[in-house]
Amino acid sequence: MDYLVKNGVLVTGEGQRRGDILVSGGKIAALGTGLAQEGAQVLDASGCLVFPGFIDVHTHLDMECAAGVTADDFPSGTRAALAGGTTCILDFATQDKGGTLQQALDAWHRKAAGKSACDYGFHMAITDWTEDIPQQMEAMCRQGVTSFKVYLAYDNLRLTPEQVGKVLSAAARLGALVCAHCEDGDAVNQGVARQKALGNMGPQAHPLSRPNWVEGSAVAQFLDLAKQAGAEAYVVHLSTREGLEAIRQARQGGQTVWAETCPQYLTLTDQVYALPDFEGAKFVCSPPIRSQADLEALRQAAQAGEIQTVATDHCSFRFHGQKDLGKEDFSLIPNGLPGIQHRPLVMYALSQGDCPLTPSQLCALLSEAPAKIYGLYPRKGSLEVGADGDLVIWDPNAPVTIRAKDQLQATDYTPFEGWACPGSPRTVLLRGQIRVQDGQVLEGFPGQFIPRSTR
């Protein structure tokens, strides 16, 4: 079936214009005004914004952890993503200790193949350094996995600074990109022990155990290692003024640094950890949600283009049966928030209120820049002829209120409960086929693995 999207406002990162889009054979076939195509089904987008499909470059689906497995697997997580207008995700395949990168990639393909409602790709998290890791990274790139993650925290995941430097050097040679979880792991361990020694065992101890400087110093260290390696760098889930300042300094020194933040760091403050009845546990994530001053600094950075992407770090757990495992010890609360469904809604609401952003800025943050940075562009994140027919017809006059009871995410809460969003996706196309109609996700799992190019 061919589709002709008529009379919409076409939004790209560069601007917006009124026009039509013809989608044929799964691709964008023509752009213009007054387009006609015999046999094409017309989708009237009058009064609507038409975005390229949104891309979430930071998700954790079907991930094993101390609390068992994350609440969302690929079927539930990708259906939830589509409901919000996200047509492609990048999930983190993670190397096991003693395992190879190929074994991790094979495992993630098994998790996702035939079980994804939207398209997907993988980053590869390197957690166990061996001298042949550079060769393994090259093999990943040949298979379309062209980005790698390193952790500076978590004893079971982190590499040494020397090993991080070697990963960065290998990535620079390959034209790959390294992204990093930037928290000082030793400082976190000491902070957790300190809070426990003081008898602070509730959710409020979580942010106290990893204050702002823990992120700021780790960002600075990672970027210094990237500079020594001659590598571009990507900082995930930026949450603090200190981390932002470290990025600014590196950029002033001539480095290429990409910055990502998440909706929770743009909308919530650390007051959530003081909620009664253990409700604060719902918001335990790492890095933690920060102060109003940090929130304001990140909003200004997003408006100024200093932050390139807004992803979710979707790592969902149920409050009952998972989060409450840490009721007597905050360090046992599974770290992570759900957000894969509501990122576009929250960001659109924010753009119309407390953090004014143009539709073009939203497009850049949610679609175009993620695609360009991670080797998906122009197949994804684009309204160009030849791009995949991934489209979001966004109705700015279709308000919704976010409620956990209505969500497709497989969790029993949302951190954005009660948020009033002035607009929402009406129709979502994935590779030229309608997958969301009038806000309802259609059945089926047509999502495909999308190999990515090196830089």
Predicted segments, located by residue:
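Alpha-helix-loop-beta-strand connector modules within alpha/beta enzyme cores
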Residues: 102-118, 167-180
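Metal-associated gating/positioning segment near the N- to mid-region
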Residues: 45-115, 132
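Histidine-rich, glycine-flanked metal-binding segment
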Residues: 1-53
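C-terminal cap of metal-dependent C-N hydrolases
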Residues: 8, 324-329, 385-451
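Histidine/acidic residue-rich metal-binding segments in metalloenzymes
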Residues: 135-310, 326
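His/Asp/Glu-enriched, well-ordered alpha-helical/loop segment
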Residues: 204-230, 280-282, 304, 308-310, ...
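Divalent metal-coordination and catalytic microenvironments
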Residues: 8, 21, 26, 47, ...
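Short, surface-exposed connector motifs at secondary-structure boundaries
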Residues: 86-90, 116-121, 145-147, 225-233, ...
